[in-house]
From Swiss-Prot:
Enzyme class: hydrolase
Function according to Swiss-Prot or TrEMBL: Endo-1,4-mannanase, a crucial enzyme for depolymerization of seed galactomannans and wood galactoglucomannans.
GO cellular component, one term: extracellular region
Pfam families: Glyco_hydro_26 (PF02156)
Carbohydrate-modified residues: 21, 142, 152, 323
InterPro entries on file: GH26_dom, Glyco_hydro_26, Glycoside_hydrolase_SF, Rhodanese-like_dom
Classification lineage: Eukaryota, Fungi, Dikarya, Ascomycota, Pezizomycotina
Keyword vocabulary terms for this entry: Carbohydrate metabolism, Glycoprotein, Glycosidase, Hydrolase, Secreted, Signal
Protein name (Swiss-Prot/TrEMBL): Mannan endo-1,4-beta-mannosidase man26A
pH-dependent activity: Optimum pH is 5.0.
Signal peptide as annotated in the record: 1-18
Keyword Signal: yes
Temperature dependence: Optimum temperature is 45 degrees Celsius.
The organism of origin for this protein: Aspergillus niger (strain ATCC MYA-4892 / CBS 513.88 / FGSC A1513)
GO MF, one example: mannan endo-1,4-beta-mannosidase activity
Length: 335
């Protein structure tokens, strides 16, 4: 579908979308969202309940799927991580924005996560090297203290510096009219990332700071905002999330559909948000999704061995999935 039509044409031509059981229809939380961002959310809503949009993290792994399975995933997952100032200071370089623009040129969907290196206080030891700097154990940065500095503290200003650095990259995408599924501050309740290390309150405050800085200060509106928790204590709220997601890494060979998490997230969102799997190891079996009525809108396989080792997702299974008429790929023509 995306190989044939632009996002804007999808917004205005529901007939081109093929069969669809539209179960949810709501506008973007950002009332100033660009036409492209509105079209992207609308497209996902139109597929929700009848199709499952395929995704693959990392351009190398995306290319692997296209080469070895013969079908290209609809969504490319990329990471803003090496645009973080702390990473740049250690020589980090990134071509993520270039990858995103290229994928948009294929009429693909782009999803961006941000493994945010702590703004300062990376331990940078043999045990905890700088490149682990988004992990709680690898930094002494305290998010609770930073967000409660009331705009005057050094660490608060460093948070803004980092957000500004990512906003500069989002602006490049905005100028290219590229909408993105933006999933910042992911997996907060795990506590293994510094933004979730001090509990829900500072995490939620940081979410608000980030959203305000990007949309109001930088006037950027080309994002569909993706939250990433099924824990009600950590969920920012439907007024702050366009799509609600989980990350799901079951045992090797388990292609179940995480029905318990789906139901939990339905409750958390009051059945008012599209639900998706922002990261997976083994892909949920589309037959099981349909049979159990667990309608994750999309799934994004993590990179490297998760897609390439032949164990997490055996090639025979991948061929089955990508040739299923319910699975949306880049060259999907509709069921």
């Amino acid at each position: 579908m995306f190989a044939k039509l632009s996002l804007l044409s999808l917004l205005f031509s529901s007939a081109a979308l093929g069969a669809s059981n539209q179960t949810l229809s709501y506008g973007n939380i950002d009332k100033s969202a660009t036409p492209e961002a509105r079209a992207l959310l609308k497209y996902i809503q139109l597929q929700y309940g009848s199709h499952y949009i395929s995704g693959q993290q990392d351009i190398d792994s995306w290319n692997w799927v296209e080469k070895n399975i013969g079908v290209a995933p609809a969504i490319l997952g990329s990471d803003f991580t090496y645009y973080s100032p702390s990473a740049v200071a250690h020589g980090g370089k990134s071509h993520a924005v270039e990858d995103v623009i290229q994928h948009a040129g294929r009429n693909g969907i782009n999803a961006l996560v941000w493994h945010w290196y702590a703004p300062t206080c990376l331990l940078d030891t043999a045990k905890e090297p700088w490149y682990k700097g988004f992990y709680t154990e690898a930094t002494c940065f305290n998010v609770s203290e930073a967000v409660n500095d009331h705009g005057n503290g050094t660490n608060y200003k460093l948070l803004l510096r980092d957000i500004d650095a990512i906003a500069a990259q989002i602006k490049r995408l905005d100028q290219a009219k590229v909408p993105i599924l933006f999933r910042p501050l992911h997996e907060p309740e795990g506590g293994w990332f510094w933004w979730g290390a001090q509990g829900p309150a500072p995490f939620k405050k940081l979410w608000d700071i980030l959203y305000d800085r990007i949309t109001r200060y930088h006037n950027l509106h080309n994002m569909v905002w993706v939250c990433n928790t099924a824990d009600p204590a950590w969920y920012p709220g439907n007024d702050k999330c366009d799509i609600a997601t989980i990350d799901h890494y079951p045992a090797v060979g388990d292609h179940g559909v995480a029905a318990d998490q789906y139901k939990k997230l339905q409750t958390v969102t009051n059945n008012e948000r599209v639900l998706a799997m922002a990261e997976v190891g083994p892909i949920p079996d589309p037959d099981k999704q349909a049979r159990e009525n667990v309608n994750w809108a999309y799934w994004m396989v993590w990179s490297g061995d998760f897609i390439e080792d032949g164990k997490q997702n055996p090639n025979q299974f991948l061929h089955k999935v990508y040739n299923d008429t319910r699975v949306v790929a880049l060259n999907w023509e509709g069921a």
